[in-house]
Every structure is written in C-alpha cells, then in structure tokens.
Design a protein with these regions (language model features):
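Mixed-charge, low-complexity intrinsically disordered regions
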Residues: 1-137, 142-147, 167-197
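OB-fold (S1/OB) nucleic-acid-binding surfaces
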Residues: 141-162
Length: 197
C-alpha cells in the first residue's frame, strides 16, 4: 500500500498535503464497497441528467469535487485503514454528526504509522487540516496577487476569512466581488485554500 504524498520539502513553511484523489484511489483499492457507496450517494445528490451530454471540463470538476467530498466530508468506521486486507474490508461509511473519522484522516494516520516520510510535522498538518476544513460559497471581498491572499466572506455560514492562495489571488487579482466555491482550512496559523476554486 503506497500513495503519493505531496509534501513541501522545498518550502518548510508550507504544510504537508495529501491529494484527495489519492485518498479516493486508496479506498477504491482497499474497500471498494465503501468507495462505491459514497460514489452512489454523491452522484445521486449531484443529479446529472443522463440524457444530456456534458463538457469534459464539467465532468472533471464534478469528479474533483467528489474526491474532496469523499476525503473530507464522509466518515468511516473504526480507526480507519490498517493495512490488513480483512480488517480494511470491515470499514463502513458512518452517518451523523461526530460519527467515525474522515477517509483523509484515516489514510493520513495509516501513512504516519507505516511511512517514515510522514513525521510529526506532517501528521500535525494533516490533523489540523482535517479538524478545520470546510467547504462553502464565498464572496470575494479582495484579491491581491502581490500578497498572494484573498479576503472572502462565507455567504452560507457567515464569517470573513483571509486565505493564502497564490494561484487564486493571481487569478482574481483586484477583484472586489464575485463568488467562488472553495474549501478552506486553518493550518499552521494561516487560512489556506484546499480545493480548486
């Protein structure tokens, strides 16, 4: 069992990152039933018209959102992945507030136990990301490419956040308005963007 982990060795100031596609792919290999059930739930909610042809970019974006939703918003039973095939097949999706742990955290904890490249710093980043991340719709109050930051207002839950995201800040530089759907988390004392805006 191995997965790709993007750590920021070239910049120790940035947190470690685990790609949500890798999380979904690992669960697809270790417990296809959990992966398939989550996929059915997600696509039922998305409710795409099967008779309509969608552009490839739309379908890719929906798939990216599935990876994020599965990794961060689903919950699985027990302690998560163990590396023991028969144990991992017993994992089930959990429902309700506070039930289980996220697939993201399950894989992060597994990697911390099994992969010497994942140390104390990385697992702390993963746990903090898992604790603080949330997805919402945000109104862009300000974007500065120079600062590499966005100031966004959560229009669903309320609150204003300053988010470090060089790519999005460059893309929306100078914007004082406009809406994005994004996932943000507070890791290492800084709000950061954790999905594709």
């Amino acid at each position: 069992m191995s997965t790709a982990t993007t750590t920021t060795a070239e910049n120790a100031g940035l947190p470690a990152m685990l790609d949500t596609k890798d999380v979904a792919e690992m669960f697809k290999r270790c417990n296809l039933a959990v992966y398939a059930e989550a996929r059915r739930i997600y696509y039922r909610e998305v409710n795409l018209n099967p008779c309509k042809k969608y552009p490839k970019q739309v379908l890719q974006r929906i798939e990216w959102w599935f990876w994020d939703w599965f990794a961060y918003d689903c919950a699985v039973s027990g302690i998560g992945l163990t590396g023991n095939e028969s144990e991992d097949l017993r994992i089930e999706l959990q429902y309700g507030p506070g039930a289980g742990i996220s697939p993201f955290l399950a894989l992060a904890e597994f990697m911390y136990d099994k992969d010497e490249r994942i140390g104390t710093r990385e697992i702390r980043d993963f746990r903090e990301l898992d604790d603080t991340n949330f997805a919402s719709m945000f109104w862009i109050r300000d974007a500065s490419a120079v600062k590499g930051r966005l100031t966004v207002e959560d229009i669903i839950h309320g609150g204003v956040y300053e988010v470090a995201d060089v790519h999005a800040a460059s893309q929306y530089d100078g914007a004082h308005g406009g809406m994005i759907v994004n996932r943000i988390a507070h890791v290492r004392g800084v709000g950061r963007s954790w999905s594709i805006p």
